[in-house]
């Protein structure tokens, strides 16, 4: 999808305020919903994914399973709200050995497991809105000893609220981010800078 796009800085793949936030996403929902609502905390439109079973309630990008994103930027960032329910997301990449690997983070797992084609890891989220920063290059190197080449697919499962999903060439400070990439919390009048912790230690 983005193979022929010049990639630098920030590359957004989902923005909840956009006219068609799920334009490049496929929706798979059973016993749940994906809908745009106004979040009371930030007083802004967000995308809510909820489901009784996280494995049957998710969105994925690109829509066509035979196509790939082709995003080479190494930082995957999501601005999401902790709904105090099970939540997971998955990023599929390809490394310099031309092997496809999947990284799955969830808030209900207690230990990291590294298998040849999938690495699952626990994710700790703070209350309310979180900015999840996922260093794909670092995780590929630590889990498999190979080099990150590009991201192929993304899958975001219930249960969460999403403000924005984007890729970046590096980590940006609050001051460096464009205004539309920031998350303002009107009640406290300040930026949310919460970033979850990932555990990458072997069992």
UniProtKB/Swiss-Prot annotation:
Q: Where in the cell is it found?
A: Nucleus; Cytoplasm, Cytoskeleton, Microtubule organizing center, Centrosome, Centriole; Cytoplasm, Cytoskeleton, Cilium basal body; Cytoplasm, Cytoskeleton, Cilium axoneme
A cellular component term, taken from the record's GO annotations: nucleus
Q: Which InterPro entries match?
A: CFA20/CFAP20DC, CFA20_dom
Coarse class of the protein's main subcellular location: nucleus
Q: Which keywords does the record carry?
A: Cell projection, Cilium, Cytoplasm, Cytoskeleton, Microtubule, Nucleus
Pfam families (UniProt xref): CFA20_dom
Return one Gene Ontology term, BP aspect: cilium assembly
Domain of life the protein comes from: Eukaryota
Q: What function does the entry list?
A: Cilium- and flagellum-specific protein that plays a role in axonemal structure organization and motility. Microtubule inner protein (MIP) part of the dynein-decorated doublet microtubules (DMTs) in cilia axoneme, which is required for motile cilia beating. Involved in the regulation of the size and morphology of cilia. Required for axonemal microtubules polyglutamylation.
Q: State the family named in the UniProt similarity comment for this chain.
A: Belongs to the CFAP20 family.
What is the protein name given in its UniProt record?
Cilia- and flagella-associated protein 20
Q: What is the species of this protein?
A: Caenorhabditis elegans
């Amino acid at each position: 999808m983005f193979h022929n796009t010049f990639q630098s800085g920030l590359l957004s793949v989902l923005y909840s305020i956009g006219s068609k936030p799920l334009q490049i996403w496929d929706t798979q929902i059973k016993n749940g919903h994906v809908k745009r609502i106004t979040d009371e905390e930030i007083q802004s439109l967000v995308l809510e994914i909820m489901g009784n079973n996280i494995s049957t309630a998710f969105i994925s990008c690109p829509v066509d399973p035979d196509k790939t994103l082709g995003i080479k930027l190494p930082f995957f960032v999501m601005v999401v709200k902790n709904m105090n329910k099970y939540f997971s997301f998955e990023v599929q990449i390809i490394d310099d050995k031309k092997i496809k690997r999947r990284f799955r983070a969830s808030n209900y797992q207690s230990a990291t497991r590294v298998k040849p084609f999938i690495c699952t890891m626990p994710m700790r989220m703070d209350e309310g809105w979180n900015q999840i920063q996922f260093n794909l290059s670092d995780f590929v190197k630590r889990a498999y000893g190979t080099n990150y080449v590009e991201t192929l697919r993304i899958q975001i499962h219930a249960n969460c609220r999403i403000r924005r999903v984007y890729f970046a060439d590096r980590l940006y400070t609050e001051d460096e981010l464009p205004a539309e990439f920031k998350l303002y919390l009107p009640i406290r009048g300040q930026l949310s800078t919460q970033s979850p912790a990932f555990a990458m230690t072997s069992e």
